[in-house]
């Protein structure tokens, strides 16, 4: 068939539907087929980017679930190496330096034989007698935790009675350190460097297994003993010999792990003794063990804070002792604190952005709140002696964010705690931190007085979120206003003699006057009125002094020395008023504890 003419093609294009349909199908195919290769690649890349960008928000939400406050320092350092730390070594070989042929076959410790061995060790540092004592000491420490009978081939270790049992433990704990040092010729002030140099001492080769046996048995006793007095006595005696652990790094790690556990979970005396051991370890071994002690204590502290307890009076001690350890090496602790506070800020930022229920609960958890409390106290303890301004700025931003995350009367306690933190940081650093707006917002809480009167004080409530029945109680607003007065009194007391005090106190006084006018509770009105009168009196006092000055407002040095003499006067009216409020608060706390 020949080619159609021009007129025929024109007719077909206009009138035949099949031709139009086919051309429409082929047109995009032809364009795609002959498109430039680079353009096709670019189009593909754009599509891939769109696919990748879609779940971005979802990834952020999932990322929040993976953030843990106690995971910022990496893995635990509390795993103990098993080589040389297991109990498979058994008892010491009693043939060391022994030429006697009549070695006891039955190893039963009697009172008379114990007295003989103790006398030989105490006066002569006789090594074979020390070996026997350490074997019986090990048997006593392992009592009830290993099968009775033959512990080694053809050798049986046993103790005659309970009195002998107690004496062998007490004697070894009291005399072992002195005996080791006497044999090696070491003084009581020997450092870990001297212990490490003992490798070249021939006496050390024969004494090292004895020292190791003593520590292994003692650590087992501390870990397994159920009597608090035995544990306390053992920890006290163990502190003297810590320097010897330089030769046994595995046992040193095990001691850190056991001490951290006792520090967190032990009774008050045990907890204090365990902390002293951790403190001594970090001082004796410096950088080698400071990080390990700090990280393990930090994680144990946060884990304990996340567990609800009926009695949480020990937590201030745990916090203060951890702050004390951090203060031993502020430079290293600064790095850890910076990482931890940054993590707190990330969690808060996510919670503020999403207002997700789980995110808010994370911020209000005991772990988060106590972590903030820890670093607030660390900064306050060291801000005068060290440059901690970056940490101070960041933690203040975090505290302000926590206070404003959810505003409402049920979160009154959390807001009060946040303001206490800010007042504490301001007082210790000498830097002005505004808190008036956070305090005065508490005046606007709408409450009713329909419920029963609560006998419990606000400070005694352990939860962050108040129960609903508290909001309807008769004295909730009363306790709320008392908190406002106390917080403002502390804030004003710091700046009561500053040249800018009239400007600082004017707006809070105006807000308090409005509250005084609309309040119908006479008891509250009297308290608020007295506070207003005291503040206004101090405003007038500072204003009169300020009117007499001759220096410029730009003269910062003169402004800082303003009213320094008056500041030292404890009889100033506002100072006395502030002291009465503090005394009243302290008296309330004492009654609560009783």
Curated annotation (Swiss-Prot):
Subcellular compartments: Nucleus; Nucleus, Nucleolus; Nucleus, Nucleoplasm
Motif (Nuclear localization signal 1): 8-15
Effect of a null allele: Plants lacking both CRC and RBL exhibit strong floral meristem (FM) indeterminacy with reiterations of extra floral whorls in the center of the flower associated with reduced AGAMOUS and SUPERMAN levels.
Motif (Nuclear localization signal 2): 35-42
Stretches for region Disordered: 1-21, 35-58
Listed GO CC annotations: nucleolus; nucleoplasm; nucleus
Mutation effect (residue 8 to T): In rbl-1; indeterminate flowers in crc-1 background
The entry's keywords: Nucleus
Primary location class: nucleus
GO biological process per UniProt: floral meristem determinacy
Skewed-composition ranges (Basic residues): 1-13
Residue spans of biased composition, Basic and acidic residues class: 36-58
Stored InterPro entries: Noc2 (IPR005343)
Known tissue expression: Expressed at low levels in roots, shoots, leaves, stems, inflorescences, flowers and siliques, with highest levels dividing tissues.
Summary of the function given for this chain in its UniProt record: Collaboratively with CYP40/SQN and ULT1, influences floral meristem (FM) determinacy in an AGAMOUS and SUPERMAN-dependent manner, thus contributing to the floral developmental homeostasis.
Further comment: 'Rebelote' means once again in French.
Subunit description: Interacts with SWA2, NOC2 and NOC3 in both the nucleolus and nucleoplasm. Binds to ENAP1 and OBE1.
Family: Belongs to the NOC2 family.
UniProt xrefs under PANTHER family: NUCLEOLAR COMPLEX 2 AND RAD4-RELATED (PTHR12687), PROTEIN REBELOTE (PTHR12687:SF8)
Descriptive protein name: Protein REBELOTE
Organism lineage string: Eukaryota, Viridiplantae, Streptophyta, Embryophyta, Tracheophyta
Gene name of this polypeptide: RBL
């Amino acid at each position: 068939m020949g080619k159609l003419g021009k007129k025929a093609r024109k007719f077909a294009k206009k009138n035949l539907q099949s031709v139009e349909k086919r051309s429409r199908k082929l047109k995009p195919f032809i364009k795609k087929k002959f498109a430039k290769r680079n353009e096709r690649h670019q189009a593909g890349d754009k599509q891939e980017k769109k696919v990748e960008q879609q779940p971005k928000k979802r990834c952020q939400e999932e990322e929040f679930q993976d953030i843990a406050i106690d995971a910022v320092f990496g893995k635990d350092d509390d795993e103990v190496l098993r080589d040389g730390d297991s109990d498979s070594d058994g008892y010491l070989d009693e043939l060391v330096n022994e030429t006697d042929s009549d070695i006891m076959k039955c190893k039963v410790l009697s009172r008379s034989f114990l007295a003989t061995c103790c006398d030989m060790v105490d006066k002569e540092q006789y090594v074979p007698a020390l070996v026997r004592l350490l074997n019986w000491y090990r048997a006593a420490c392992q009592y009830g935790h290993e099968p009775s009978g033959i512990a080694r081939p053809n050798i049986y270790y046993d103790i005659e009675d309970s009195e002998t049992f107690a004496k062998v433990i007490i004697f070894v704990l009291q005399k072992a350190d002195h005996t080791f040092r006497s044999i090696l010729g070491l003084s009581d002030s020997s450092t870990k460097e001297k212990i490490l140099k003992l490798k070249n001492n021939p006496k050390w080769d024969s004494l090292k297994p004895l020292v190791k046996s003593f520590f292994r048995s003692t650590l087992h006793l501390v870990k397994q003993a159920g009597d608090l007095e035995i544990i306390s006595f053992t920890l006290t005696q163990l502190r003297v010999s810590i320097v010897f652990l330089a030769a046994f790094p595995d046992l040193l790690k095990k001691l850190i792990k056991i001490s951290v556990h006792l520090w967190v979970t032990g009774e008050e005396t045990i907890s204090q003794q365990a902390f002293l051991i951790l403190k001594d370890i970090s001082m004796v071994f410096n950088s080698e063990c400071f990080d390990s002690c700090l990280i393990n204590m930090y994680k144990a502290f946060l884990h304990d804070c996340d567990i609800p307890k009926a009695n949480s009076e020990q937590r201030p001690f745990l916090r203060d002792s951890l702050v004390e350890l951090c203060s031993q090496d502020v430079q290293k602790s600064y790095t850890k604190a910076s990482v931890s506070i940054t993590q707190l800020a990330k969690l808060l930022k996510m919670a503020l952005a999403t207002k997700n229920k789980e995110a808010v609960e994370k911020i209000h958890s005991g772990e988060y709140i106590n972590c903030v409390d820890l670093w607030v106290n660390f900064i306050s303890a060291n801000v005068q002696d060290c440059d901690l301004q970056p940490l101070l700025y960041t933690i203040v931003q975090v505290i302000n964010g926590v206070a404003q995350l959810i505003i409402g009367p049920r979160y009154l306690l959390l807001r009060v705690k946040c303001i206490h933190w800010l007042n504490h940081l301001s007082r210790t650093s000498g830097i002005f931190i505004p808190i008036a707006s956070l305090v005065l917002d508490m005046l606007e809480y709408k409450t009713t007085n329909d419920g029963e009167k609560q006998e419990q004080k606000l400070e005694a409530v352990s939860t962050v979120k108040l129960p609903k029945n508290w909001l309807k109680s008769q004295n909730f607003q009363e306790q709320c206003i008392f908190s406002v007065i106390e917080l403002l009194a502390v804030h004003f007391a710091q700046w009561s003699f500053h040249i800018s005090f009239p400007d600082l106190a004017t707006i809070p006084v105006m807000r308090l006057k409005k509250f005084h006018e609309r309040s119908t509770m006479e008891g509250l009105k009297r308290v608020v009125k007295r506070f207003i009168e005291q503040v206004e009196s101090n405003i007038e006092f500072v204003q009169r002094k300020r009117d007499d000055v001759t220096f410029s407002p730009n003269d910062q040095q003169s402004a800082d020395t303003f009213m320094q003499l008056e500041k030292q006067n404890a009889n100033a009216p506002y100072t006395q008023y502030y002291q009465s409020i503090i005394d009243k608060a302290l008296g309330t706390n004492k009654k609560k504890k009783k």
